[in-house]
């Protein structure tokens, strides 16, 4: 579509998972929708993410194992008195409905991980499985030429320059020389990828976040929902206190569009806005973020001009340990260490004094918090992940693949430091040799007994899930013994905003007095997270993003159907 219509029912800003869910829901409900994306690609940070969606008590949960009450208890335990009970209740009630609605009316398909504990597995209300959904792999060839509109994942999460793999695929690839079933799976993957590259710039079999946004985008195209790329809203229009439309800029042209039911803000949050980063995030944080570069607080600025305001937390973002490496084109790769290395047996995280500072198998958010605490003591220092040759052969390390596939290049460009002895490694890392030797010796004793006497690594279900089930006595603790030894620098990285626009349970943006602004909604990282800076499980950003996008669209539909500006009720 090349022209901006003069009027729609609902205008959605931002084509990530939250925005596309809002647009798709509105279209299914019969509204005239326009989806605007300021970049030339759809998907946002969702396209780079793992694609996990935290939805308790959905149709994919094992029967009888979960409930609204159990999930609410868990959130109350995990978030504490910071929990916005009204919005949390709306999320828990509506998230299963959102899944049903999308699967019944669109090309969106989910499946539950067979086993995936909540991150704070020892808390009351936590579950071992059923809450974490992932998108079913998607064949993007059905998009035809519109496949080019889809934002690719981070290059470091693809093999051979363009093949996406999920955890199941990785297991088969690593076991291809030991199991005939894994060998066959690997051959199918490679054959499919080779065929795809004859037609496309990358593999068309999409998994994780790319599969999720691919399915949402395909569903929008199937319903002929107009999606305008490289288009930006510069201001929101008001009439008697109600949002009525926006001024839209596309190329050199500017026009006004009326939005009868309102506007949904889903522009990605503030993670790439320099001034807000300095104001809201720790001073020790640099620009290490895998969030898309377009997340520059557009929704915040638009909302603030019409009365909205930012709600802050003691932790205004979500964290992960990241490593950095300069790409061949000069750009900086930022690799989040989520699940593939740090929780496996034989990885140690050390501070600039050569000592452990964290349970390596804890959640990536808590690991990030530990990095900040450590760097407050060593403001000019660098923390490292270290391992031995056995580890890197079996599990890889950061951007280094298992089997040492690209190890030589990583050593050559300085991403990985290697040494034959602990003393030599200490010298190369500028840490005290006696401290490092003592740290490794203690951890090697823990590997023998299976009990981490310092941090309790491997003592809950989530941590053991990150480990290697074939390793004992503790799946998360292994010795560092076989040279050469390896290390890479790790830093705290932000993976998405927690602070956001204050909203009510219907996803309506609130003004500074707490009243909803008629016709203005927010979801995703534009909305203040219901988790208030805590990270209870995988998918706690995408799950609420999609759910509140669904809530916003449904509320807008009901408002318009009533034919008046005041909804007067919940979603």
Tell where the protein language model's regions lie, with residue ranges.
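An anion/pyrophosphate-binding glycine-rich loop and adjacent beta-alpha core
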Residues: 121, 127-129, 134-184, 300-302, ...
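Internal hydrophobic alpha-helix adjacent to the cofactor/substrate pocket in enzyme cavities
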Residues: 302-309, 437, 544-564
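Conserved N-terminal/central alpha/beta ligand/cofactor-binding core
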Residues: 38-226, 346-349, 356, 362, ...
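A conserved beta-strand/loop element that lines the FAD pocket in flavoprotein oxidoreductases
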Residues: 220-234, 313
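Glycine-rich loop(s) and the adjacent beta-strand/alpha-helix scaffold that form part
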Residues: 203-210, 222, 250-328, 507, ...
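A glycine-rich dinucleotide-binding beta-alpha-beta segment and adjacent secondary-structure elements
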Residues: 235-243, 435-530, 534
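Extreme N-terminal leader/targeting segments of oxidoreductases
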Residues: 1-10, 28, 210, 214, ...
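Beta1/beta-strand and adjacent pyrophosphate-binding region of the FAD-binding site
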Residues: 4-18, 34
